Every structure is written in C-alpha cells, then in structure tokens.
From Swiss-Prot:
Transmembrane segments: none
Cofactor: [4Fe-4S] cluster
Record-given protein name: 3-isopropylmalate dehydratase large subunit
UniProt cross-references to InterPro entries, sorted A to Z: 3-IsopropMal_deHydase_lsu, Acnase/IPM_dHydase_lsu_aba_1/3, Acoase/IPM_deHydtase_lsu_aba, Aconitase_4Fe-4S_BS, Aconitase_4Fe-4S_dom, IPM_dehydratase_rel_enz, IPMI_cat
Organism in which the protein naturally occurs: Stutzerimonas stutzeri (strain A1501) (Pseudomonas stutzeri)
C-alpha cells in the first residue's frame, strides 16, 4: 500500500463523514474573519437565531478597507472616508462584540492583514484546517496546515457548525531542488512556478512545495510561496513541518504551552509526506536557474526574468495566446520585445499578505539604505503586515531608513494590493508591487501592476525602472 501525502493525512485527520456523492464533511479548526466577507454571514446567524458553534475557534481583524495613513487611523472609524468601508469595519466590530469573538480592532497593535496575524499570534498551527473568506488563506499551509479560502455562505456555515462539505482534491508536488542564487527570493520561486505551469496548472490539486530550496526557506518565505498557490490555480498550498515550523510557533500567544506543547510537537512531526507517497502530478524546478522575476502582463503567469524582453505576439503561433499577449501589451502600455529593464515606474508598493512581514521589510530596507526614491516615482509605500511587524521594524530602525530614502511609512492593512481603500493607482500608472495579483484594475482602474519581490520593488523605487537588484547589493 502506497504511503500518504501530507494532504492525505490532513484530510483524513479532519474527515467527519464521507457522503454518498463523494464529498466529505470536514471539521474546521480555525476560522479567521475580516470585514468584507463576514457581514452577511453574521446576519444569517441572526436570522436563523443561531450562535457560533465554537466561539474560541474564531479570530477576526479588519484589513481590506482600513486606511493606512497615521492621521486617518488616529481618527478612528469616523475618519474612514468611504461610507461602505466605514460601515463594513464598524459592522465587524459590532458582530464580534455581539457574538463574543476575539477581534483585533483597527487601532489594536495586534491588528493587521488576516494572513499575517494568524501565524504571528500562533492561531495558525501545524495540522490544523484553517479557513477564511479570502482566497489567499492558502498562506497558512506553510505550517503543514490544510488552509483555503471560502465564500460568504461558507463563512456562515463554519460559524454555525464548525464544518464544511468539500471534495478531496488531487495531489501535486512542486519540487525545487538546489541552492537559490544570491538575491533570488521565495517570491521569485513562486512567480517562476506560475510562469512554468500557468494560472490553471494547479486546478483541482492541493500543491505541496518540497525540495531542498523550499526547506532552506524561512517560515516567512514559505508563507510567501503558499500565499500564491492560488495564482497557480490551486486552492491549497502547503509545506511539510520541520524544525523551522516548530521553532516559529513556539512561545506565540495562542500556541500550546507546557505539556500540551510537548504533546503537540510529537503529533506535528508526522506532518510530512511519506517517502513512498504517490502524487498525481510532479513539477520540478532547479533553484539555480531562477532569476529575479517581474510580471509584465495582466496575469501572474505573464512573468519573466528581469533580464528578458516582453514577448512579441507576431511570433506566437497559438491564436489564443497571441490575442492574450496583444491585449496585455495594450493594457500595460508596453511594446513587443521591450526590455523589462526599460519599464519605468510611477509608484512602488511594498506590502500585502504576500510580502509584508519583517524579513520582507529588512530585504527592502537593505536596498533603500543610503539611496533616494527616483524623481519619476510619484509615491513609494511601505505598509507593514501588522502592528507588531511595524513595531519590530521601528525597533530595528527600518522606518527611518525608508523615510530618509523618500518612502512613505504606513500603518498596517491590505493597502494598495487591491482598490478597496484610499491607496490606489491612477489610470495608466505603472507600479512595482510585492502583492499577488496583476489583473486589469486590481490596484485601481487602469492601473498597471508588476509583481516583484520586496528587494526588487525597492530597487525599482530608487532607480525609477526595473533593475536586477543584485546590481545594488553585495553578496
């Protein structure tokens, strides 16, 4: 009998009942809530006269709509200019108060992006099932957890029953072997993976990232990779538990303590795929072949190494691909065969649930130190992923480095990742962004998004165009 994958093990641990139609009832250990996808779910509970099944399994924070300037934050709810945004944040506060759910409110130092605060607080643990009304919940899979996004109706279902109906996915292993070259990061790995398999490559699969290059990554790097499993077409991304996982979790506020900790660690050590586990699909990359990546088009799969040129639709034989390239070039305001390094930037955004943790900010600060934001860059934002990340960065003096270089140092939130708060692109503006999606209008109507790592974003900010960051930093 073949061994089990990590996904197989997590599924079996949480399968309450197998149904006749092939789906299963799955128990949910952790439910994370934010202001955008939860209001209707709470209203559904009220209308049905229900209460949350397990209050302590839920944790909440506002992130999508919150303003990130200090002045607006200090003004509290009334300072949120957009009425819908203000109502959503206020409604989350009221719902959590009414139902007794732990919430880190807008000006709590523990507030932040949902996928930053869960791991940071130890609310995300190995072996858990974790859900949230947000597609990038796959981030939490970095801890050897089964984590995925859910819709608003499912948010209500989890609140009411602590279970979900789901169908088991296929298994895909993405193996990245070897040592990453200097200056190449987790963000570059996952962009290279998406460039290789496409945004539909992981459809119907749970992705397990493995190999020596993945094991060498920090937990923060692993979170970046799992975060963008969704852009590879998968609902789930995960990394097996090892000593780095356990070291990261130990001592965090909601992690087990004492004898419970010892017991948990013993259980977590089995959260790896067996040596003889069978995967439906295996994708392999050599770490040494990966260079700093830059997305050029309107899909995350439209990505190239920084030393390449954007494609020419005239030489594309596939009519569908040809049309896609032509449309993307037009929207992005680029010319066929244009060098990536010739793309000039109007704005730079360092933040999001993909890249707003302390290691991300350190990497960007290393590039920014002693330099100035280029004259053609109208705005360069640095938005920490949580109040605690911000606090730590300030203790290390990173805020001063950014401010002296001409960056804006902001309060935590989703910010310019998506156009749901005051931080937006103007039409036609090019932005080097450490976020996860570059769809048309994602950062603002007509905005042109280029996905990069934090170091590459900082390099673009200080030079005004894309450049291989390795030209600016020392090995």
């Amino acid at each position: 009998m073949a061994g089990k994958t990590l996904y197989d093990k997590l599924w079996e641990m949480h399968e309450v009942k197998r149904r006749d139609d092939g789906s299963s009832l799955i128990y949910i250990d952790r439910h994370i809530l934010h202001e955008v996808t939860s209001p209707q779910a709470f209203e559904g509970l009220r209308l049905a006269n229900r209460k949350p099944w397990r209050i302590d399994a839920n944790i909440a924070t506002p992130d999508h709509n919150v303003p990130t300037t200090k002045g607006e934050r200090q003004g509290g709810l009334e300072a949120i200019a957009d009425e819908v945004s203000r109502i959503q944040v206020q409604t989350l506060d009221e719902n959590c108060d009414d139902f007794g759910i732990l919430e880190f409110k807008m000006n709590d130092v523990r507030q932040g992006i949902v996928h930053v605060i869960g791991p940071e607080q130890g609310a995300t643990l190995p072996g858990m099932t974790v859900v949230c009304g947000d597609s990038h919940t796959s981030t939490h899979g970095a801890f050897g957890a089964l984590a995925h996004g859910i819709g608003t109706s499912e948010v209500e279902h989890v609140l009411a029953t602590q279970c979900l109906v789901a169908k088991k996915m296929k298994n895909m292993q993405v193996r990245v072997e070897g040592k990453l070259p200097f200056g190449v990061t987790a963000k570059d790995i996952v962009l290279a993976v998406i460039g290789k398999i496409g945004t539909a490559g992981g459809n119907g699969h749970a992705l397990e990232f493995a190999g020596s290059a993945i094991r060498d990554l920090s937990m923060e790097g692993r979170m970046t990779i799992c975060n963008m499993a969704i852009e590879a077409g998968a609902r789930v991304g995960m990394v097996a538990v090892d000593e780095k996982t356990i070291a990261y979790v130990e001592g965090r506020p909601y992690a087990p303590k004492g004898a419970d900790w010892d017991k948990a660690v013993k259980l977590w050590q089995d959260l790896v795929s067996d040596d003889d586990a069978v995967f439906d699909t295996i994708v392999e990359l050599k770490a040494e072949d990966i260079k700093p990546q830059v997305s050029w088009g309107t899909s995350p799969e439209m990505v190239l190494a920084v030393d390449q040129n954007v494609p020419d639709p005239a030489v594309e034989a596939d009519p569908v691909k040809k049309d896609s390239i032509t449309r993307a070039l037009k929207y992005m305001g680029l010319q066929a065969n244009q060098a990536i390094t010739d793309i000039r930037l109007d704005r730079v955004f360092i933040g999001s649930c993909t890249n707003s943790r302390i290691e991300d900010l350190r990497a960007a600060a290393e590039v920014a130190k002693g330099r100035k934001v280029a004259a053609n860059v109208k705005q360069a934002l640095v938005v920490p992923g949580s109040g605690l990340v911000k606090q730590q960065a300030e203790a290390e003096g990173l805020d001063k480095i950014f401010i002296e270089a001409g960056f804006e140092w902001r309060e935590p939130g989703c910010s310019m990742c998506l156009a749901m708060n005051p931080d937006k692109l103007g039409s036609g503006e090019h932005c080097a962004s450490t976020s996860n999606r570059n769809f048309e209008g994602r950062q603002g109507a007509g905005g042109r998004t280029h996905l990069v790592s934090p170091a590459m974003a900082a390099a673009a900010a200080v030079t005004g165009h894309f450049i291989d960051v390795r030209e600016l930093i020392q090995a």
